[in-house]
């Protein structure tokens, strides 16, 4: 078992009272699983991801990664935000290396490997202002995976990109997953994206966020969004929103 999320609940305290954001979340991921999480806005998807990342330790329950209880960020978790969050004063290769020294041959070789995997050859010495948003997000992906984390956490990483760039980065991510078999949890509002990428789809209900349904995705790779089997699964997911009363909030 790579990741175990056990009885996780989360509350926020405001002047008007206590607000429960997550309620008794339980699910497990084996090594190499690719799970997408979808649900109404405000259901706690991003909050759950931050808890798994160790960025929020004020919650009930526990997160176990590779047998270790998680209370803070570590090399076990890689995190990719919607914004690339690159350092503007560092080059592409320096951003990928982050706090590691490129003078170290092992680090330099690892950075070179990831530059090739995310198809940024020739842009190693470029600065963030000199590359596109899609390329910047590829740098963020490489940076998050450089240390070989047990799980990669992605919080709507392609949400701000145009359709063409988004589609391209989906292929880049799938290529990485197929090569490395990194366990991934990917939050998205896009049902097609959820189906296209993952082998399991976690549907969350509105606040307080609970797991409404987990749907196994057995479509073979590479997937065709226009195929009958893809559309049938899409209908199945949509029915969960409609019949489960989740459609009241935008997804």
Curated annotation (Swiss-Prot):
Gene3D superfamilies: P-loop containing nucleotide triphosphate hydrolases (3.40.50.300). It catalyses: ATP + H2O + aliphatic sulfonate-[sulfonate-binding protein]Side 1 = ADP + phosphate + aliphatic sulfonateSide 2 + [sulfonate-binding protein]Side 1. It comes from the Bacteria. SUPFAM superfamilies: P-loop containing nucleoside triphosphate hydrolases. InterPro entries: AAA+_ATPase (IPR003593), ABC_transporter-like_ATP-bd (IPR003439), ABC_transporter-like_CS (IPR017871), ABC_transporter_ATP-bind (IPR050166), P-loop_NTPase (IPR027417). It is a peripheral membrane protein. One of its GO terms (cellular component) is plasma membrane. GO terms for molecular function: ATP binding; ATP hydrolysis activity. Its main location: membrane. Residues 3-231 form the ABC transporter domain. Keywords: ATP-binding, Cell membrane, Membrane, Nucleotide-binding, Translocase, Transport. ATP binds at residues 39-46. Its EC number is 7.6.2.14. Coiled coil: none annotated. The keyword tRNA processing does not apply. SMART domains: AAA. It holds the Pfam family ABC_tran. It is an enzyme of class 7 (translocase). It is found in: Cell membrane. Belongs to the ABC transporter superfamily. Aliphatic sulfonates importer (TC 3.A.1.17.2) family. Part of the ABC transporter complex SsuABC involved in aliphatic sulfonates import. Responsible for energy coupling to the transport system. The complex is composed of two ATP-binding proteins (SsuB), two transmembrane proteins (SsuC) and a solute-binding protein (SsuA). This is Aliphatic sulfonates import ATP-binding protein SsuB. It comes from Bacillus anthracis. The gene is ssuB.
């Amino acid at each position: 078992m790579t990741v175990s999320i056990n009885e996780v609940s989360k509350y926020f305290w405001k002047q008007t009272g206590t607000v429960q954001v997550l309620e008794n979340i339980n699910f497990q991921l084996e090594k190499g699983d690719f799970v997408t999480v979808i649900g109404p806005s405000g259901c706690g998807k991003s909050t759950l991801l931050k808890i798994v990342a160790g960025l929020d330790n004020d919650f009930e329950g526990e997160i176990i990664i590779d047998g270790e209880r998680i209370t803070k960020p570590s090399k076990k978790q890689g995190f990719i935000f919607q914004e690339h969050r690159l350092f503007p004063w560092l080059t592409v290769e320096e951003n990928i290396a982050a706090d590691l020294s490129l003078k170290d041959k092992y680090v330099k070789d690892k950075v070179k490997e990831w530059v090739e995997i995310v198809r940024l050859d020739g842009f190693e010495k470029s600065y963030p202002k000199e590359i596109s948003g899609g390329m910047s997000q590829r740098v963020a992906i490489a940076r998050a995976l450089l240390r070989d984390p047990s799980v990669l956490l992605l919080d709507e990483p392609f949400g701000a990109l145009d359709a063409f760039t988004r589609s391209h980065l989906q292929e880049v991510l799938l290529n990485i997953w197929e090569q490395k078999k990194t366990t991934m949890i990917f939050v998205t509002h896009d049902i097609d994206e959820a189906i296209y990428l993952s082998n399991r789809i976690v549907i969350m209900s509105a606040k307080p966020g609970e797991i409404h349904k987990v749907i196994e995705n057995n479509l073979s790779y590479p997937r065709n969004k226009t195929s009958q089997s893809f559309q049938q699964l899409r209908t199945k997911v949509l029915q969960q929103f409609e019949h489960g009363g989740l459609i009241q909030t935008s997804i």
